Amino acid sequence: MLTSSPYILYSDGNGHIFEDTSLYVTGRTGWDAVPVPEDEWIELPEGGQLYELPGRRGIGIDVETGQMRLCDKGWAVAAFIPPAHTGFYLAAYETLSDAPTLPLFCYTAAGWQNNKTYVPCVRIEQDIRQDCAGYDQQVVEAGVKKALETYPHNRLVQHLANNCALTYQCPAARNYFIGRWECPIPSSPACNANCIGCISFQPEEETIISTQDRLTFKPSAEEIIEYTVPHLESAAFPIVSFGQGCEGEPLLMWQTIKESIIEIRKHTQRGSININTNGSMPKAVAELCKVGLDSIRVSLNSVRKHIYEPYYCPNNYAFEDIFESLKVMNSFGGWTSINYFVFPGMTDSIEEYEALRKVIRETGLKMIQWRNFNIDPDWYLGKINVADTGECMGVKQLLELIKEEFPDIKYGYFNPPMERIKGNFEMDFAH
């Protein structure tokens, strides 16, 4: 554990990052820069990266005076923390009037001490399925080649190979081609929400671009079954998951998904069938549960309607439908998770905490996946029109309080395999 705060980092605009030993780094919660408790810093995990934030000056605490001031030596710096980790504070900076909107990544605070980069976060998930060290690109490419030869006419396999694994190096797609763990099934080119931070589609007039291209076709049940059954039969801790970052809303394709699940279960009972969704169609969820859907993960930025709706901009569904979908899955004895976008200063507000407690009690939620929110913080708060985020407790304390009140709820970052759901949650997974 650190005994003093790390120093602030800045970038010279030419790809070089330096520390400024006249300033301690601060963290951001909501709109505010604050000191970060020393026990919340850990070394930047493997797979993490540092970003220059153009048009922004970092906010630090003067080592001599203890006063906050800007670091005017260069541009502010933030960290991308890798999957399985949840950040406690955002990078704190002042944005200049001509600063560009930041792309859709997470911007965690970062500091420098003892010749190492430190970030305020925790490893929330022990599953190693997306750890950077676990990938060998040659093995991925060999797996891609073999799959394309095995399924030469399967558009989904081609999409996962050429778009996801090779172009974007998507961890889920790469795992499929290595033959392990969770296998993605993108299934819907359409969506019934217009999320302002959508990672697969952005309007041309917007100041940001999506991080990947969306699926352009509707896959058939045959295409889905062809490659998922062998995966379930042979992979370790196997999961197949409808609903991915390169598509719209999978529940819009529920009939095809239903047909797929029926056929998959005719061939194998092994593994877990999961759907990642916005939870907008509880009746469709019920239909899928009837034929063997094992788990659901519902994504949301907030469990409060007035924060959720300006971000998701839902079409033809109500905020309340989300929680009904969780209740439906629980009524069938399935596994329920939320994919909870963590924004320090919003997620840990007292109002959000109280609303989350209510959701857990009313839905029987089994797991929270504490995901870092990939979005420009200023842009996001402006878009949803939040000027005051209210009283906050800190993300670390939020994690502790929820666990204290609901000791059976599980924390993580990934969908658990059936072995983990039915067996020892602390041991039965890839590690």
Regions found by a protein language model. Give the residues of each.
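N-terminal pre-triad scaffold of radical SAM enzymes
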Residues: Y168-P203, I239-F242
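Catalytic cores of alpha/beta
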Residues: K283-K290, G345-E362
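Conserved strand-turn element in the central/C-terminal portion of the radical SAM core barrel
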Residues: C313-N315, S325-E352
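Short, flexible helix-coil linker/hinge segments at the edges of structured domains or between repeats
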Residues: A142-K146, T150, R155-C170, I199-Y227
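Auxiliary Fe-S-binding modules of radical SAM enzymes
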Residues: M1-Y151, E354-H431
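Alpha-helix-loop-beta-strand connector modules within alpha/beta enzyme cores
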Residues: W254-Q269, E320-G334, T389-Y411
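Active-site beta-loop-alpha junctions enriched in small/polar residues
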Residues: G245-E247, N278-S280, N301-V303, F341-F343, ...
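Core AdoMet radical
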Residues: E182, P186, Q202-E259, R265-A284, ...
